[in-house]
């Protein structure tokens, strides 16, 4: 556990390259910590109800990488580590936050993403329907995340099993 995202990123990169011999930013088996609450991917009737900041997800399968809206995304099949009875699910990850020195997208980046997604629905005449389409767009709702091997102290709102996190 470290005090800053910058330091966590340096340690994570070193662990991935020198111990796990992984060169890519994302690999099957990676455990990622969610950095922003997400209400889109799980139904309200699911065990957790939503994906919370601090939850850990494990990547079971990487379906594809997508570059869209000048950002990088990964479509993956994931499992929530803290909820073993919760079925695994398909989701989209926002890779911009994976190595970011900030916890999540900044205000300007978030606004830029919103505007670019809105362009996809510019042919919708009704402002309300356009707003609903934007808010239900899978890329707009991509999960912000950081690598869960090393984490900083202010990102954690719950206790993490470090044996699982470090050893995968």
Give residue spans per PLM region.
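Core RecA-like ATPase module of SF1/SF2 helicases and allied nucleic-acid translocases
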Residues: 1-168
């Amino acid at each position: 556990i470290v005090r800053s995202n910058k330091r966590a990123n340096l340690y994570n990169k070193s662990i991935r390259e020198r111990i796990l011999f992984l060169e890519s930013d994302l690999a099957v088996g990676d455990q990622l910590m969610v950095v922003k609450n997400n209400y889109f991917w799980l139904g309200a009737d699911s065990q957790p109800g939503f994906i919370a900041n601090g939850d850990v997800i494990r990547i079971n399968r990487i379906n594809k990488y997508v570059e869209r809206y000048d950002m990088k995304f990964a479509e993956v099949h994931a499992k929530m580590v803290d909820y073993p009875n919760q079925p695994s699910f398909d989701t989209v990850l926002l890779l911009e936050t994976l190595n970011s020195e900030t916890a999540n997208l900044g205000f300007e980046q978030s606004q830029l993403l919103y505007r670019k997604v809105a362009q996809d629905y510019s042919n919708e005449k009704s402002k309300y329907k356009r707003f609903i389409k934007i808010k239900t767009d899978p890329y707009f709702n991509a999960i912000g995340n950081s690598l869960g091997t090393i984490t900083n102290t202010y990102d954690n709102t719950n206790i993490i099993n470090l044996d699982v996190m470090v050893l995968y």
